[in-house]
Amino acid sequence: MVSPSSQVTGYNGSVSFTVSPNSGFKAELATNTCGGTLSGNTYRVSNVTSNKTCSITFKSTPTLYTKLLADKTTRPGARTSFSSVLTTDNTKTLYTSTENGITVYYFAGNATDNWVKFGKNSSGADLFWRIIRTNSDGGIRLLYHGTSTTATDAYIGTSAFNSSASNIAYVSYMYGSLGSIANARENTNNSTIKTTIDNWYTSNLEAKGYTKYLSTTAVYCNDRSTSDNTYFGAYTRLNTNKTPSYDCTDTNDKFTVDTSTGNGKLTYPIALMTADEVSFAGGVFVKNAETWYYKNSANGSSTGSTFWWLLSPNDWSGSYAHVFGVNGSYSPGNLDYNGVFFAYGVRPAISLKSCVKTSGGDGSANAPYTILDTETGC
């Protein structure tokens, strides 16, 4: 938009116009045929000695995915060993892996520049998140960090994973009838923790109009694969083999809103971080790990002393169902597990759509990435 559309000046004079970019563009010049200058929304052409027709274009606003890859220029590649914790301080660093054969990028160690400010809670307070990784759909996966980068209560509340631990089905985010994993994979009943998360979502992100920014194709893996009806897939990968994976084998364990990429059982595009994602980020089973998912920007525990739930089943002992989680300050960042009937911290995970644009920031705690407000989310 340009105002006015034309100006008259004397020989060697100057003219100014008020210009504003359309949605999806920012007030920075991409092309500029008259060699003018832009300050804020004022475009100025000096030393005019003849009639001129001027044309300018603005730079497009980058997607968060594009900005993330442009900013994080250190690329160590794929990690080859997950037997030791990774807690090294780092910035501008992205590691690589794959999800469904597609390259994805993730933060590991004590990354200090994976902060995002996105959304508001029901009280109108800004919400802060940590970037976990990119998804195979090009989206950006985030972990909840409350209303401050220095939060020591970065969870939406406490909840049991399920109200009882007395059946193998209770390792499930959703389950069908009881008695077996095959029955559990019918996915007709919400877990206790899913109800907690969904209720928070409707009162906060949905109520404030932020659903349009979130991916419905992102997969949240509640991996219930088991060869012996005792230990589940994540336990074997992370305790026995030390080989985390972003892949989710069984469609019934792929919790999604959209049926094109998973089971389509989610009503809302929100769930939890997985134990495999913690391992990629630098955690190791039953070892302390003061990595980015544990720390706040003041280098303290994001959840104080509170243990918080992950999405990954650990084991069925024959009488108790156990699910993975992360310990608070009494055993810092330790990837552990607990009986599902205990009430522990709930830190939701969401995924921004691949087309979501950033309005600024560099990912640091002082300048977190911010999201451009748009009508469609893109």
Predicted segments, located by residue:
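Conserved "repeat-terminator" motif of extracellular CCP/Sushi domains
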Residues: 41-61
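Long, domain-scale functional regions
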Residues: 60-378
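Short structured motifs
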Residues: 2-4, 42, 334
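Conserved N-terminal submotifs of small, disulfide-stabilized extracellular modules
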Residues: 1-12, 26
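Append "Rare intracellular matches occur via the same short Y/T/C beta-strand/loop motifs
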Residues: 15-19, 51-58, 350
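Surface-exposed coil/turn segments at beta-strand junctions on protein surfaces, enriched
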Residues: 8-12, 38, 47-49, 341
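Well-ordered beta-strand positions in beta-sheet-rich domains
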Residues: 6, 42, 53-55, 128, ...
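Surface-exposed interfaces of beta-sheet-rich extracellular modules
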Residues: 13-44
